[in-house]
Amino acid sequence: MSSFNIHEILEQLYAAKSLTSEQSQAFFERVVQGQVDPIILSSVLTALKIKGETAQEITGAANALLAQATPFPRPDYDFTDIVGTGGDGLGTINISTASAFVAAACGLKVCKHGSRSVSSKSGSSDLLAAFGLNLDMSAQQARQCLDDLNICFLFAPQYHAGMRFAAPVRAALKTRSIFNVLGPLINPARPQFELMGVYAPELLKPIAEVHKELGMKRVMVVYGSGLDEIALHGETQVAELIDGKIIEYTLTPEDFGVQHYPVEAIIGGDPSENKIIIEQILQGKGSDAQQAAVAVNVSALLVLNGKADNFKEGTKQALAMMLTGKPLQLLKTLAERSQC
């Protein structure tokens, strides 16, 4: 990479020409090493956004961030992640975080990668901190929790320290950039299975292609009528990576055996408000809409990990598991273990 030339990259982008995966990787490696001037970074992020980021550019950036991440002792068993880009602006309850604990209670190994809020009042780490989870637990400690409890949480800033170099530019630009889609792609444990929500339908196919380039086994990329998760208020568009191919289809609440509910029925609040709501959901005491919103996302995770034959069966499994209260117990146990 000694021939790396930042001005060539800039000129290429100014001409609306896409970068190769290698060029993108070389550039973002320098970003997370603190070697890129903020003005240059601002120009590149803006040019990429106006042109529209390609799968190759996103893959290169993801590979750069994964290469620079703090290592995680990766297990040799299969495990999964459920995560959204955020940025849908709707401020719903923490569906993917709640779903992670239900899925773990159903027997999946879930390595949840997350950070602070992007668009909601409460990101995954904000919520888990409200439950008493120590976000700074070591990688070894997190791995032990994955082994023993079926679940762990990896706090993105702890594993991607180099992202701090981009933070001032991202804050100043106040707009979505390639970084918004990178978060769900850079779990340092590198799961082979993932349910990933995106904030715009045009991201579905490119992000599925990125997962393929990153060597994932099976992934569902979803956009639920404005939500970065599977929706109850309308259709959910899906791009699924399966057996090395990407297939596109649409899901409705009927496919999961549940009713339609308005999106207003799953709006959340700040972390302390969301904590109360999630506490209810994880023991089957939430509203019908709240229980269903979590159940359909758990169902998709169960199907893509081979733990349910179809979405209706997966939804039934998830709803039944919440009624046992086991998912809440799991969350409390993880919080206790993280403080040791």
From Swiss-Prot:
Keywords: Amino-acid biosynthesis, Aromatic amino acid biosynthesis, Glycosyltransferase, Magnesium, Metal-binding, Transferase, Tryptophan biosynthesis. GO terms for biological process: L-tryptophan biosynthetic process. It holds the Pfam family Glycos_trans_3N. Gene3D superfamilies: Nucleoside phosphorylase/phosphoribosyltransferase catalytic domain, Transferase, Pyrimidine Nucleoside Phosphorylase, Chain C. Its EC number is 2.4.2.18. Pathway: Amino-acid biosynthesis; L-tryptophan biosynthesis; L-tryptophan from chorismate: step 2/5. It comes from the Bacteria. Anthranilate 1 binds at residue 84. SUPFAM superfamilies: Nucleoside phosphorylase/phosphoribosyltransferase catalytic domain, Nucleoside phosphorylase/phosphoribosyltransferase N-terminal domain. Mg(2+) 2 binds at residues 228-229. Its cofactor is Mg(2+). InterPro entries: Anthranilate_Pribosyl_Tfrase, Glycosyl_Trfase_fam3, Glycosyl_Trfase_fam3_N_dom, Glycosyl_Trfase_fam3_N_dom_sf, Nuc_phospho_transferase. It catalyses: N-(5-phospho-beta-D-ribosyl)anthranilate + diphosphate = 5-phospho-alpha-D-ribose 1-diphosphate + anthranilate. One of its GO terms (cellular component) is cytosol. GO terms for molecular function: anthranilate phosphoribosyltransferase activity; magnesium ion binding. Mg(2+) 1 binds at residues 96, 229. Binds 2 magnesium ions per monomer. Anthranilate 2 binds at residue 170. 5-phospho-alpha-D-ribose 1-diphosphate binds at residues 84, 87-88, 92, 94-97, 112-120, 124. Homodimer. Catalyzes the transfer of the phosphoribosyl group of 5-phosphorylribose-1-pyrophosphate (PRPP) to anthranilate to yield N-(5'-phosphoribosyl)-anthranilate (PRA). Belongs to the anthranilate phosphoribosyltransferase family. This is Anthranilate phosphoribosyltransferase. It comes from Psychromonas ingrahamii (strain DSM 17664 / CCUG 51855 / 37).
